[in-house]
A protein has these predicted regions:
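Membrane-embedded catalytic cores of phosphoryl/pyrophosphoryl-handling enzymes
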Residues: 118-252
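Hydrophobic alpha-helical transmembrane segments
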Residues: 50-67, 81, 134-137, 157
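N-terminal signal-anchor transmembrane alpha helix
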Residues: 20, 81-101, 234-241
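Interfacial segments of alpha-helical transmembrane regions
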Residues: 65-93, 154-156
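Alpha-helical membrane-inserting segments
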Residues: 63, 89-98, 190-202
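Transmembrane helix interruption/hinge and helix-loop junction motifs
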Residues: 53-54, 72-73, 149-153
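N-terminal transmembrane-helix/juxtamembrane module of multi-pass inner/ER membrane proteins
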Residues: 7, 12-58, 94-124, 246-253
C-alpha cells in the first residue's frame, strides 16, 4: 500500500509474522510504555528542551573553536570535513534509507499504540521512526570526536550528551527503544569507519606528532581547552534545568 507521503507501506502485522520478530516488537512496545512520559511538568520541559538541537549550538561552537585552536588549518578542515561526512552518512542511512524502507510507524503515529502515548506540546514527529536519526547522528559524532581528541572526560561528556538526546526521543514517544538501539549501532559504526578514513588520510598527507604531557591529550589538545568544553556542557544542562522550571511556573498561571 502506498501512503499519501509516497512511501510504500508494508503491513506491520504480516511483516512481523513473516520475520518471526513479533516477540521483539512486543517487548519494544512494553519498554517504550515504561519510558514514555510522566506526570512531571519538569521532566516534560527538560526532555523537550534537550531534544532540540538548537539547544546544543553553543557546545558545537566551542567544539569547533577547540578543533581549530589545537590544529593547523589543513588538519582542522580535514576533521570538520570528516565530521560533516559522519553526520551526512548517518542521517541519510537513517532517514533517507531505513525509515522509508522499513516503514515502521513511530509510536506516536502507530494506530495500535498512538493513543497510549504521552506527548508533549502536541509533538508527534514524522510518520516513520526506524531507525532514529537523532541516535545515529549523536552517537556518530560522539565516537568520532572521542577518537579524535582522546580525552576520557570529553568522551564521557559526549556520550552523556548522546544518551540524553536518545532518551529524550523515547520519553517524548517518537521512538521505540529498538529505533534508538539500531540508530546507535549505525552511528557508532559510521563514526568509527570515518575515523579510520581520517587516520589513513592524515598519515598519508599530514604529519602530526604524538604528545606526551599532562597538559595535552595524546593527540595534542590542551586539557585546559577540554575543560572549556566541559564547562559549556554544564552550562547547557543548567539552561535546560532552568527552562524546565520556568515551564512549571508558567503552567501555574
Amino acid at each position: 500500500m502506498v501512503t499519501p507521503d509516497g512511501y510504500l507501506h508494508r503491513s506491520s502485522k504480516s511483516f512481523n509474522e513473516s520475520m518471526n520478530i513479533q516477540p521483539i516488537i512486543d517487548l519494544d512496545q512494553e519498554l517504550l510504555l515504561k519510558i514514555n512520559g510522566s506526570d512531571s511538568l519538569f521532566w516534560d520541559g527538560f526532555m523537550w528542551i534537550a531534544t532540540n538541537m538548537l539547544t546544543w549550538i553553543p557546545l558545537a561552537v566551542v567544539l569547533l573553536y577547540v578543533i581549530f585552536k589545537n590544529n593547523k588549518v589543513k588538519e582542522a578542515l580535514l576533521i570538520i570535513g570528516m565530521l560533516a561526512l559522519v553526520i551526512t552518512l548517518t542521517d541519510q542511512i537513517a532517514s533517507g534509507f531505513c525509515k522509508p524502507f522499513f516503514a515502521r510507524f513511530r509510536p506516536t503515529q502507530d494506530p495500535e499504540l498512538m493513543y497510549q502515548i504521552d506527548i508533549v506540546n502536541g509533538y508527534r514527529g514524522g510518520i516513520y521512526g526506524f531507525v532514529s536519526s537523532h541516535a545515529a547522528n549523536t552517537f556518530g559524532i560522539a565516537i568520532f570526536l572521542s577518537l579524535i581528541i582522546r580525552s576520557w572526560s570529553l568522551g564521557i561528556m559526549l556520550f552523556s550528551w548522546a544518551c540524553i538526546n536518545a532518551y529524550s526521543r523515547m520519553y517524548l514517544g517518537v521512538h521505540y527503544p529498538g529505533d534508538i538501539f539500531c540508530g546507535t549501532l549505525i552511528g557508532l559504526g559510521i563514526g568509527t569507519l570515518i575515523y579510520m578514513l581520517y587516520t589513513y588520510i592524515r598519515k598519508k598527507f599530514i604529519h602530526s606528532p604524538n604528545y606526551i604531557s599532562n597538559q595535552y591529550t595524546s593527540t595534542g589538545y590542551l586539557n585546559s581547552d577540554i575543560s572549556i568544553i566541559l564547562f559549556v556542557f554544564i552550562l547547557t544542562i543548567y539552561y535546560i534545568l532552568i527552562g524546565s522550571m520556568i515551564k512549571i511556573q508558567t503552567s501555574l498561571f
